[in-house]
Amino acid sequence: MDKSKRSFLKSKRSVRRRLPPIQSGDLIDYRNMSLISRFISEQGKILSRRVNRLTLKQQRLITVAIKQARILSLLPFLNNEKQFERTESTARTTGLRTRNK
């Protein structure tokens, strides 16, 4: 190939496959808190399949396990560890009008 055609070819990058998040020996159970907590967001929401990189069956089992743990009070429904600071709302104060009588 001459030099002009060579610049258009894409370089082949090696594709690194990530390890599956659930190994074959892992037990998907509502009591396995170390496993379940990996699939919950900071806000306490169940992460999607695309984010987790799980199969459909694994995602269903994780979802059921998380819901069982929530019902049995092993997991909170909402994660309230973050204390949200309430700041003054500037939109409300600037939008007020005074009525002239």
UniProtKB/Swiss-Prot annotation:
InterPro entries hit by this protein: Ribosomal_bS18, Ribosomal_bS18_CS, Ribosomal_bS18_sf
Keyword rRNA-binding: yes
Source species, domain of life: Eukaryota
Record bears the keyword RNA-binding: yes
Keywords: Chloroplast, Plastid, Ribonucleoprotein, Ribosomal protein, RNA-binding, rRNA-binding
GO CC term (a single one): chloroplast
Localization per record: Plastid, Chloroplast
GO terms classed as biological process: translation
MF term (GO), any: small ribosomal subunit rRNA binding
Signal peptide positions (record): none
Assembly with partners or alone: Part of the 30S ribosomal subunit.
Family per similarity comment: Belongs to the bacterial ribosomal protein bS18 family.
Listed name of the protein: Small ribosomal subunit protein bS18c
Organism from which the protein derives: Coffea arabica
Organismal lineage: Eukaryota, Viridiplantae, Streptophyta, Embryophyta, Tracheophyta
